Amino acid sequence: MAELDLMAPGPLPRATAQPPAPLSPDSGSPSPDSGSASPVEEEDVGSSEKLGRETEEQDSDSAEQGDPAGEGKEVLCDFCLDDTRRVKAVKSCLTCMVNYCEEHLQPHQVNIKLQSHLLTEPVKDHNWRYCPAHHSPLSAFCCPDQQCICQDCCQEHSGHTIVSLDAARRDKEAELQCTQLDLERKLKLNENAISRLQANQKSVLVSVSEVKAVAEMQFGELLAAVRKAQANVMLFLEEKEQAALSQANGIKAHLEYRSAEMEKSKQELERMAAISNTVQFLEEYCKFKNTEDITFPSVYVGLKDKLSGIRKVITESTVHLIQLLENYKKKLQEFSKEEEYDIRTQVSAVVQRKYWTSKPEPSTREQFLQYAYDITFDPDTAHKYLRLQEENRKVTNTTPWEHPYPDLPSRFLHWRQVLSQQSLYLHRYYFEVEIFGAGTYVGLTCKGIDRKGEERNSCISGNNFSWSLQWNGKEFTAWYSDMETPLKAGPFRRLGVYIDFPGGILSFYGVEYDTMTLVHKFACKFSEPVYAAFWLSKKENAIRIVDLGEEPEKPAPSLVGTAP
């Protein structure tokens, strides 16, 4: 069949509503119209009936086997009469509704009257190529209605775009290829997500183990402090007890001594009472009277009042400590209120309403500077190929030269990254950086980012808790959750980074002499303190944290160059 990409509404290529009379294998032309059939015609009719029964039997067999179209089986010629010598069909005629081998197809190729018939690849079952409404072969495709039609359907589809079946197949095959590619892409993304999730499960176990270790250590210190406080209190009470007992024993000894002295005085008085000499009596009694001590020591030890005060201090301190311990549970319950857990199983802090602000977004550099925040690079997180200078305000990728940094759990092992020492939480912040070289990334991430992993979710462009902006030497690209968004923004050496934590906004601005140009804005879901994050992926990349007192330079012909 000749190619026909588009067919105008109207009659379709020649096709009859009913199949024409079968062809004679000998003559190669249709039988003449007459009242009686020739022997050849009778033979053809008999053959057609026989072949029709065979086709029905084959179709029923195919249907029983769950293959109604007979796909996957060899299609035989309907005109080969000997069942043992039937030849494989090479074409099917949609007009005749018959399959032909190479020999029996020749009449369709040489007879001009048969050349208008619609030929296709061999099909086992012709019923599905037959219009159920008009009993005519399906010979075209209606694009708006997305269905195959016959010649008689043309009136019903008047005004529609109609193409040949071959053209429709080519179009649908192209669409199928696009669908396959899209499905393969989605499958790859899904497999990558599964891979990242499996890798993250290990990170979850490590993170939880680290938190457990910290909790055990902290509670161990707390228990040790409680035991020490208990020992100190008991020692204090024992010392007070010994002091009070010692004081009581001293008073007792003194009183016993006074009792003995008073017993002597009593005996002396009895002796003087027996003196008959008046002068002697008066002299001795007056002498005794002058030496008599009539004072008595206090027999009350005021320890009970002191103990009451000590008991009050211990009780109040204990109640306060218990309240502090109960705050552990309350704070954990607040964290667990988060409905969605991040892939790192992070917990969400509830931002207090007092931190929300209704102030408008800043638009000029002067307005941004109201939220100026001074940050520095954290040397405990810097990769061993990153050199920190200028009081930790400049970082340079010195690959392959390593720096003698101590091996710490917080240090990045694979990705050339470094975080800020300062966290960003609950408020608005603004800082500026200068970038040098293609392959630099500036962004935010959470503290729980994996420091030792080699997977993409360990870098600030490959997970759903980091947001970053990349300069690739030609343009900027925004990264989130391993998905990139090319940006149409001019090159800028100095970038302004604005964070509105309560509003969930992270914006990057190109900072020039007299203008602030928005490069990209992220809508974020901040649920814990975040940190400024930097990735220097190539050798000699450099990033410098700008002193906000420095005025931006006037634009130069090449803004983002190599590191000075």
From Swiss-Prot:
It is found in: Cytoplasm. Its EC number is 2.3.2.27. GO terms for cellular component: cytoplasm; cytosol; plasma membrane; PML body. Residues 355-553 form the B30.2/SPRY domain. Highest levels found in testis, ovary, small intestine, colon, placenta, heart, skeletal muscle and mammary gland. More highly expressed in the fetus than in the corresponding adult tissues. Expressed in basal keratinocytes. Residues 165-203, 243-274, 320-340 form a coiled coil. Zn(2+) binds at C131, H134, C153, H157. PROSITE patterns: B302_SPRY, ZF_BBOX. A zinc finger (B box-type) spans 72-122, 126-165. Residues 1-69 are annotated as: Disordered. Residues 24-39 have a biased composition (Low complexity). InterPro entries: B30.2/SPRY, B30.2/SPRY_sf, Butyrophylin_SPRY, ConA-like_dom_sf, E3_ubiq-ligase_TRIM/RNF, PRY, SPRY_dom, Znf_B-box. SUPFAM superfamilies: B-box zinc-binding domain, Concanavalin A-like lectins/glucanases. The keyword Repeat applies. Phosphorylated by ULK1. It is an enzyme of class 2 (transferase). It catalyses: S-ubiquitinyl-[E2 ubiquitin-conjugating enzyme]-L-cysteine + [acceptor protein]-L-lysine = [E2 ubiquitin-conjugating enzyme]-L-cysteine + N(6)-ubiquitinyl-[acceptor protein]-L-lysine. It comes from the Eukaryota. The modification Phosphoserine is found at S116, S203. Belongs to the TRIM/RBCC family. PANTHER family: B-BOX DOMAIN CONTAINING, TRIPARTITE MOTIF-CONTAINING PROTEIN 16-RELATED. E3 ubiquitin ligase that plays an essential role in the organization of autophagic response and ubiquitination upon lysosomal and phagosomal damages. Plays a role in the stress-induced biogenesis and degradation of protein aggresomes by regulating the p62-KEAP1-NRF2 signaling and particularly by modulating the ubiquitination levels and thus stability of NRF2. Acts as a scaffold protein and facilitates autophagic degradation of protein aggregates by interacting with p62/SQSTM, ATG16L1 and LC3B/MAP1LC3B. This is Tripartite motif-containing protein 16. The gene is TRIM16.
